[in-house]
């Protein structure tokens, strides 16, 4: 049954709103050129500068028209008469006249270059380094800080020494001590210098012992931790003796021509490829080594296609699978640019996915759907409502086969809800990418604003809550962690308290999934990028003349009907100590880009857009690139010849549930698959 819910006050507001733009669009044909207030913009990161554009006719007179002004998301913020620089780089603001629907005229347009610069450097700090012994090398590091207190990422430092006879320093801060004496090491960046003074003494080490070598073979991807123990002539351990680590590789049969074979970080080693690996520790004139074999991880499982709920009318967005209050299993999917449709399925039998209902609300897109853990309510996000008060729609799921609208809620979230997170009593909803609002839904017919969290100078895409901590994915800011009930930092749903944040090198944090790993006692954060282009790469995507991946093929123009192209990967942070998070691993497929994810039972279920659904073994300590370690368990790239875009994979969201894996594909709808048990070889 398809049901349509219209909210009449919104329709009257729509008429009042569009009257002025429609009148302005009628003037579009008078415009001959656009005149910007400045020909180009230069902005210091975090600052804003005035920027306006006027439309004029052939005589130079102003024309009242509606303009579309766009810039790169997350890099520039374009407001009412101002532009704010969010990330340093060179960008372009594009401006065009909005023409009436159906017009074939090319609208006047212009492009304005924008350069966002870093604030000036205020200080350089050399981090504490170990004692310098003659005959050893110690790598130094330094950080540069801007006048606003922020750190400059990856500063190109210049290193220098006061006495090359005592110690030299390379371009990367590696200080090699040659003789006893005093030496000053300097680090400079953009005219600011810092220094550290070393007293070089004789190396007292007499013996080096290497501990931690495995007794037998290991698997690729297993982390092996070594310890180097340096002793002096009396047998006492030298705690501050600098140790350098190296790794060698001997190919076994069939393994010639392999890429990087492993990764070494201090005393930790992980093999990427099978073969004989050798780890060597060196301290001054002393060295010790250990050799061992790494065998294939051998985790591949067959994946069986169980069921498919085709959706070819609209582009499918996110999914949520849950057990209803009647004990049966259900799925909800959203849709993009559909006029506000959500779809409801009975998935109790995953091989017979059955659409049982649809619901249309006042929205252009339903990007996200959620249900409470107890199945009491569901919620639909809204973007593009006719009255520009987007908010969300809360559904009473007392009868899961007949969802009822319990409430429309928009307090504090009128500017567009892109993502949400549902708990039994609280609902977390994004507000126009600026903040998230916490709503008391104890009574779903009377939801109440409780509190909100808005991280300074940051834009967010998603929020996920686990064990009283809210993890918001905030693009260049990275992941922001807030206490909303954990209590260790004094937070609660009514009083969110900031805990920490962690920025990734790519600056495109789109989704976060926290995971506690029982075997190691570690808590990992899986941070997913979203980068909707491949500019600058060898495979850069399809030409613009082909149209948009979002459109079905148009035989008249020959455009549309092709897959999207993306990039980006999963970055894995050890969050066991929240005050000291550390990036330790990644899962990167170079040809594709990541979207939503789920982690459960030592498996990563990754929606990899055009790379399909990918299931990855994340057992044991994690280090290096999981993709090159043979940790992929299964991959499936769904296609449908009758999909919204035929035979074009675009996996959006995934969720394991009761032994099956459900996922949504933008072009083909809802799918269910199952990992089959590994078969023992027949001898």
What is each stretch, according to the model?
Residues 1-10:
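Bacterial N-terminal signal peptides that target proteins for export
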Residues 9-19:
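Bacterial N-terminal signal peptides
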Residues 24-300:
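Extracytoplasmic soluble-region selector
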Residues 255, 272-683:
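Feature marking well-ordered beta-strand scaffolds used for ligand recognition
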């Amino acid at each position: 049954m398809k049901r349509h819910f219209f909210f009449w006050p919104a329709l009257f507001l729509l008429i009042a709103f569009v009257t002025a733009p429609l009148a302005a669009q009628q003037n579009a044909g008078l415009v001959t050129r656009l005149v910007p207030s400045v020909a180009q913009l230069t902005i210091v990161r975090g600052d804003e500068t005035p920027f306006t554009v006027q439309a004029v006719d052939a005589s130079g007179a102003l024309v009242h028209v509606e303009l579309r002004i766009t810039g790169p998301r997350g890099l520039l913020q374009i407001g009412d008469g101002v532009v704010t620089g969010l990330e340093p780089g060179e960008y372009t603001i594009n401006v065009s006249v909005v023409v009436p629907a159906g017009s074939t005229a090319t609208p006047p347009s212009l492009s304005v270059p924008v350069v966002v610069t870093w604030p000036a450097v205020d200080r350089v700090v050399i981090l504490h380094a170990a004692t310098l012994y003659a005959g050893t090398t110690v790598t130094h590091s330094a950080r540069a800080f801007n006048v606003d207190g922020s750190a400059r990422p990856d500063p190109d430092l210049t290193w220098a020494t006061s006495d090359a006879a005592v110690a030299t320093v390379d371009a990367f801060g590696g200080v090699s001590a040659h003789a006893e004496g005093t030496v000053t090491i300097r680090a400079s960046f953009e005219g600011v210098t810092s220094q550290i003074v070393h007293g070089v003494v004789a190396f007292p080490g007499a013996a080096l012992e290497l501990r931690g070598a495995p007794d037998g073979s290991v698997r690729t991807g297993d982390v092996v931790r070594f310890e180097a123990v340096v002793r002096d002539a009396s047998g006492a351990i030298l705690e501050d003796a600098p140790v350098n680590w190296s790794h060698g590789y001997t190919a076994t049969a069939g393994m010639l021509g392999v890429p990087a074979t492993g990764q070494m970080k201090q005393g930790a080693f992980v093999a990427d490829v099978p073969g004989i690996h050798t780890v060597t520790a060196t301290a001054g004139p002393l060295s010790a080594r250990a050799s061992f074999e790494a065998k294939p991880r051998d985790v591949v499982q067959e994946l069986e296609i169980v069921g498919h709920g085709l959706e070819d009318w609209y582009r499918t967005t996110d999914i949520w699978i849950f057990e209803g209050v009647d004990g049966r299993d259900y799925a909800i999917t959203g849709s993009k640019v559909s006029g506000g449709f959500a779809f409801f399925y009975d998935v109790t039998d995953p091989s017979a996915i059955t659409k049982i209902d649809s619901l249309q609300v006042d929205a252009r897109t339903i990007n996200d759907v959620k249900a409470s853990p107890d199945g009491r309510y569901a919620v639909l996000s809204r973007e593009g409502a006719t009255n520009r008060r987007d908010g969300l729609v809360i559904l009473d799921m007392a009868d899961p086969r007949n969802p009822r609208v319990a409430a429309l809620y928009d307090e504090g979230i009128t500017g567009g809800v892109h993502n949400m997170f549902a708990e039994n009593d609280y609902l977390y909803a994004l507000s126009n990418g600026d903040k998230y609002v916490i709503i008391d839904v104890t009574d779903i017919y009377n939801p109440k604003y409780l509190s909100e969290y808005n991280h300074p100078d940051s834009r967010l895409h998603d929020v996920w809550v686990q064990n009283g901590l809210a993890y918001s994915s905030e693009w260049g800011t990275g992941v922001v962690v807030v206490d909303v009930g954990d209590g260790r930092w004094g937070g609660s749903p009514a009083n969110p308290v900031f805990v920490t944040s962690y920025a990734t090198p790519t600056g495109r944090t789109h989704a976060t999934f926290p995971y506690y790993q029982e075997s190691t006692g570690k808590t990992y954060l899986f941070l997913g990028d979203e980068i909707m282009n491949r500019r600058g790469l060898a495979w850069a995507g399809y030409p613009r003349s082909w149209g948009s991946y979002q459109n079905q093929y148009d035989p008249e123009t020959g455009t549309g009907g092709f897959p999207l192209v993306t990039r980006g990967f999963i970055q894995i942070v050890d969050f066991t100590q929240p005050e000291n998070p550390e990036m330790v691993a990644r899962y990167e497929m170079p040809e594709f880009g990541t979207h939503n994810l789920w982690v459960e039972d030592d498996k990563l279920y990754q929606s990899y857009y055009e790379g399909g659904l990918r299931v990855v073994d994340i057992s044991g300590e994690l280090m290096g690139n999981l993709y090159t370690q043979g940790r992929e368990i299964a991959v499936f790239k769904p296609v449908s010849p009758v999909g919204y875009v035929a035979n074009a994979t675009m996996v959006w969201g995934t969720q394991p549930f009761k032994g099956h894996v459900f996922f949504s594909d933008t072009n083909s709808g809802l799918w269910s698959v199952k990992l089959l048990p590994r078969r023992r070889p027949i001898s």
